[in-house]
Amino acid sequence: MTKKVYVKTFGCQMNEYDSDKMVDVLNAAEGLEKTDTPEDADIILFNTCSVREKAQEKVFSDLGRVRELKEAKPGLLIGVGGCVASQEGASIVSRAPYVDLVFGPQTLHRLPQMIDARRESGRAQVDISFPEIEKFDHLPPARVEGPSAFVSIMEGCSKYCSYCVVPYTRGDEVSRPLDDVLTEVAGLADQGVREVTLLGQNVNAYRGALAAGSSEIADFATLIEYVADIPGIERIRYTTSHPKEFTQRLIDTYAKVPKLVNHLHLPVQHGSDRILMAMKRGYTVLEYKSVIRKLRAIRPDLSLSTDMIVGFPGETEDDFDKMMALVHEMSYDTSFSFIYSPRPGTPAANLHDDTPRDVKLKRLQHLQATIEENVARISQSMVGKVERILVEGPSRKDPNELAGRTENNRVVNFPAPLASHPRLIGQMIDVKINHAYPHSLRGELVLVSDDASAATH
């Protein structure tokens, strides 16, 4: 009987990428297949996030739930990876003695060896070291599950924002060699991937050697240009970027590379210079707006999303008003916004915080309501227009229909003959938008040339 692995992922796209790699590593080494049901698994892995306290505590809550599974199946192995593993290390085993494996983002490729050591010794294995970027040299070729894929181009972050734990859990910035990234993207394209999302904690800081051991360095703009030249790749996204390193060369890439989508996620974190300084972000609101102004001079319809932290220590009503003014001016399409969560070991954790929790919550609700109004307005403005979408697969709402994604990252559901589904999935097609809903759009095929052939055969 085929053994199975269950992976639960918390947090960012970097973790989603890492989770896929965990499955690939275990499949190549031990023939394990992925399962969506922990009860069916022989190995259960939690890929964790420590950006906020709530996410961190949820991991231990989930661990408590799978403890019963281990009692019923003694051979079951339980592992904790990701940023909580890096931060907590062996203390995870002290708190949850039934955990067998603790590993960091940079050591997931060692999972097969850790599993062997656990079985031989009977003791929990902990490896949260930072071995540069060696994991990419030990990962098997990616297995594709659709026309879009994540590709990690670097690890870590060297910005050390005062509130952020990432540099301590993922290490400083280390870039993959250019040819290594291009080889992975080309391999994905050969398997039918049409859209890649280039991943890093701060992709703007990418400085990859042209090849392993080379002294010549490629910046992020160069990487994008090379990826765009790979046959089969029709769309390029990236996340996350940092305003401080948004160079003119990267801005110019939006004019040079049509395959770079008309959507940008650029975290601002706050709209007050005073708070940005306390966060150690390294830029002012004016400098942030200058980047957007230059980008929209090239791409007037550029869709913009961001991250925002409400209730940072010392935030006044005036600071929050400045944040809201920026939200209105930038017309953000989406925002990942949260109340500030102090993380142990970060400088901001020691700052005095005298803002009541209910005030923070009220501010967050106001911010999110405003963003939702923006989302609804932008979605409604797309009704009646023809959008180019990448067809990703059957619609979640109705498997008899198909779903795809626009450049500004909206899901579009549309009817298509069942017989045409295999031909259309993975294709770029035109869809006329007829209706806008809170979290999706609905449209109809605009049949031209190959699209018409695909839809009728």
Swiss-Prot record:
Class of enzymatic activity (EC top level): transferase
Subcellular location: Cytoplasm
Alphabetized GO MF terms: 4 iron, 4 sulfur cluster binding; metal ion binding; N6-isopentenyladenosine methylthiotransferase activity
InterPro entries the record matches: Elp3/MiaA/NifB-like_rSAM, Methylthiotransferase, Methylthiotransferase_CS, Methylthiotransferase_N, Methylthiotransferase_N_sf, MiaB_methiolase, rSAM, rSAM_horseshoe
Protein task: Catalyzes the methylthiolation of N6-(dimethylallyl)adenosine (i(6)A), leading to the formation of 2-methylthio-N6-(dimethylallyl)adenosine (ms(2)i(6)A) at position 37 in tRNAs that read codons beginning with uridine.
Cofactor annotation remark: Binds 2 [4Fe-4S] clusters. One cluster is coordinated with 3 cysteines and an exchangeable S-adenosyl-L-methionine.
Domain MTTase N-terminal residues, every copy: 3-120
Binding site for [4Fe-4S] cluster 2: 157, 161, 164
Highest taxon above the source species: Bacteria
Protein name (database record): tRNA-2-methylthio-N(6)-dimethylallyladenosine synthase
Amino-acid positions noted as binding [4Fe-4S] cluster 1 in the UniProt annotation, renumbered to this chain: 12, 49, 83
Cofactor(s) the protein needs: [4Fe-4S] cluster
Lineage: Bacteria, Pseudomonadati, Pseudomonadota, Betaproteobacteria, Burkholderiales
An example Gene Ontology CC term for this record: cytosol
Domain TRAM: 380-447
Family label: Belongs to the methylthiotransferase family. MiaB subfamily.
Record-listed E.C. numbers: 2.8.4.3
Keywords: 4Fe-4S, Cytoplasm, Iron, Iron-sulfur, Metal-binding, S-adenosyl-L-methionine, Transferase, tRNA processing
Record-annotated Radical SAM core domain positions: 143-377
Catalytic reaction equation(s): N(6)-dimethylallyladenosine(37) in tRNA + (sulfur carrier)-SH + AH2 + 2 S-adenosyl-L-methionine = 2-methylsulfanyl-N(6)-dimethylallyladenosine(37) in tRNA + (sulfur carrier)-H + 5'-deoxyadenosine + L-methionine + A + S-adenosyl-L-homocysteine + 2 H(+)
UniProt keyword annotation of Translocase present: no
Organism: Burkholderia lata (strain ATCC 17760 / DSM 23089 / LMG 22485 / NCIMB 9086 / R18194 / 383)
SMART domains documented for this protein: Elp3 (SM00729)
Annotated NCBIfam families: miaB-methiolase, MiaB/RimO family radical SAM methylthiotransferase
